[in-house]
Curated annotation (Swiss-Prot):
Source taxon at top rank: Bacteria
Matching SUPFAM superfamilies: Nucleotide-diphospho-sugar transferases, Trimeric LpxA-like enzymes
EC number(s) stated in the UniProt entry for this protein: 2.7.7.23, 2.3.1.157
Annotated region described as Linker, given as residue ranges: 242-262
GO cellular component, one term: membrane
Protein name: Bifunctional protein GlmU
UniProt-annotated binding residues for UDP-N-acetyl-alpha-D-glucosamine: 14-17, 28, 81, 86-87, 112-114, 151, 166, 181, 239, 344, 362, 377, 388
Keyword terms: Acyltransferase, Cell shape, Cell wall biogenesis/degradation, Cytoplasm, Magnesium, Metal-binding, Multifunctional enzyme, Nucleotidyltransferase, Peptidoglycan synthesis, Repeat, Transferase
Residues noted as binding Mg(2+) in the record, renumbered to the chain: D114, N239
Region ranges (Pyrophosphorylase): 1-241
Residues the entry annotates as binding acetyl-CoA: N397, Y398, S416, A434
Organism the protein comes from: Paenarthrobacter aurescens (strain TC1)
Keyword Flavoprotein on entry: no
Pathway named in the protein's UniProt entry: Nucleotide-sugar biosynthesis; UDP-N-acetyl-alpha-D-glucosamine biosynthesis; N-acetyl-alpha-D-glucosamine 1-phosphate from alpha-D-glucosamine 6-phosphate (route II): step 2/2; Nucleotide-sugar biosynthesis; UDP-N-acetyl-alpha-D-glucosamine biosynthesis; UDP-N-acetyl-alpha-D-glucosamine from N-acetyl-alpha-D-glucosamine 1-phosphate: step 1/1; Bacterial outer membrane biogenesis; LPS lipid A biosynthesis
Length: 497
């Protein structure tokens, strides 16, 4: 449905189950697939059909689930299921809560919080069919090769739906039926309300079954029909980690295929993972073993990978990111990062800049064209444009109690193994010598040197480490040097004679 289309009166998402087979302290519906919780996927699909109201029924880990849902969808109505078990009761308490302001009329959709591949498009098809045919109940079904464990859809000779038979109650003949109940429905609100008043817990499980509504609606003269989807993945739930993994893999496959159709090159889809929240431009190239998570964006002509994981990172046009682990960072157009680089949150690399091999950065802004090529750390710092930071440079930003900031200007050139002891500022165009320890501000255009003149203690090894391999090698080298000097002196004497 388009954003302008008014959707059903309400969507009810059932999310009260404990999910014990997941064997986790995290509620089942909060487990993630493709960068979004399963209930997050359910809410996204529900909102896609523009319901006037949306309710979520909770029970297990109630406060934790409610907090998560409210953070992403503050307008969703949180409804608590009481001690009466069953899907029928869950829908009944939700309907009463939705009716509190004014009694609902029209279509009510019921879906689940653990069906992460369900799309708004399929829900929209369910609603459209339900309303076009004037049905009392429309059930979403799928045809499975192996229907073991699922409720079977029973049909009359003319094809109309007559009921649902749970697997444990089905006859041998009924168990050959491959069309199964997804548990996702569109109801006429008035029919649903009336039928729920008649649903009891008088069954082997002692629960209020939502499936009982179909028979009650049919007995009251209502039409019960089905929408059959050929895409079984959209109605698959995740009850344990094995099913969760299978759904995650299928979800990822679909995301990757959609991006490839949109002009993205994925060299090895089998080793590439992309969250549903990631944005890619045309002509992006993803190399093997690349993972893109969160709000990551990658602009046109950028190359990411191999062996790269980015979370909430913005990659500019034409940039290259190789064997890098990064989060909360920005990489400018035509910039270069890696290999073996660690970008921590707050890293901003300007256009055409470079962060090279074995570098760690955190909370640092690096100007256009500046280079931090290898073996260093830059944290809590600001580096200007066209500055070259030498090998082995670090910003010593922590004094044991507080973090301090280093500011390095534009056009600066630093020698290898320079240490900046923050807080310190280096002016534009300044240089530092190799091994310098910068404890004071360096004026623009100055050369900073901090090492004393070199002094060689002749014979120290022989005196302090006699008999060692080093001492023996030093003695041999000294003898060779002495012989060479004598030979050279003889040659010079011959020239003078």
């Amino acid at each position: 449905m388009s954003p302008e289309t008014i959707g059903p009166a309400a969507v009810i998402v059932l999310a009260a189950g404990a999910g014990t087979r997941m064997k986790s302290r995290t509620p089942k519906i909060l487990h993630e697939i493709g960068g979004r919780s399963m209930v997050g996927h359910a809410l996204l699909a529900a909102r896609a059909i523009n319901p006037l109201k949306l309710a979520l029924v909770v029970r297990h880990e109630r406060d934790r689930v409610a907090e998560h849902v409210t953070a992403s969808d503050p307008e969703a109505l949180i409804v608590d299921q009481d001690d009466v078990p069953g899907t029928g009761r869950a829908v009944e308490v939700a309907l009463k809560a939705l009716d509190a302001e004014a009694e609902l009329t029209g279509t009510v959709v019921v879906t689940y919080g653990d069906v992460p591949l369900l799309t708004g498009e399929l829900l929209g098809e369910l609603v459209a069919t339900h309303e076009a045919e004037g049905n009392a109940v429309t059930v979403l079904t799928a045809v499975l090769d192996d229907a073991t464990g699922y409720g079977r859809i029973l049909r009359a000779e003319n094809g109309t739906v007559t009921g649902i038979r749970e697997h444990k109650d089905a006859s041998e003949a009924e168990r050959t039926i491959r069309e199964v109940n997804s548990g996702i429905y569109a109801f006429d609100a008035a029919v649903l309300r009336t039928a729920l008043e008649k649903v009891t817990t008088d069954n082997a499980q002692g629960e209020m079954y939502l499936t009982d509504v179909l028979g009650l609606a049919r007995d009251a003269g209502g039409r019960v029909a089905a929408v059959v989807t050929e895409d079984r993945w959209q109605v698959e739930g995740a009850n344990d980690r094995i099913q969760l993994s299978a759904l995650a893999a299928e979800h990822n496959r679909r995301i990757i295929e959609s991006w490839m159709r949109a002009g993205v090159t994925v060299v090895d889809p089998a080793t590439t993972w992309i969250d549903s929240t990631v944005t890619l431009d045309e002509d992006v190239r993803l190399l093997p073993n690349t993972q893109l998570h969160g709000s990551t964006t990658v602009a046109r002509d950028a190359v990411v990978g191999p062996d790269t994981t980015l979370t909430d990172v913005n990659v500019g046009e034409g940039a290259k990111v190789i064997r890098t682990h990064g989060s909360g960072s920005t990489i400018g157009a035509k910039a270069s990062v890696g290999p073996f680089t660690y970008l921590r949150p707050g890293t901003v690399l300007g256009e055409t800049g470079k962060i090279g091999a074995f570098y760690e950065t955190k909370n640092v802004t690096i100007g256009r064209g500046s280079k931090l090529s290898h073996l260093g750390y830059a944290g809590d710092a600001e580096i200007g444009e066209d500055t070259n930071i030498g090998c082995g440079n670090i910003t010593a930003n922590y004094d044991g109690e507080k973090k301090h900031r280093t500011v390095i200007g534009s056009g600066v050139r630093t020698g290898s193994n320079t240490v900046f002891v923050a807080p310190v500022t280096v002016g534009d165009g300044a240089y530092s010598g190799a091994g310098a320890v910068i404890r004071k501000d360096v004026p623009a255009g100055a050369l900073a040197l901090s090492l004393a003149a070199q002094r060689n203690a002749e014979g120290w090894v022989a005196a302090n480490r006699p008999g060692t391999a080093s001492a023996k090698l030093a003695e041999a080298a000294q003898e060779l040097a002495s012989t060479s000097s004598q030979f050279q002196a003889t040659i010079e004497e011959g020239k003078q004679a």
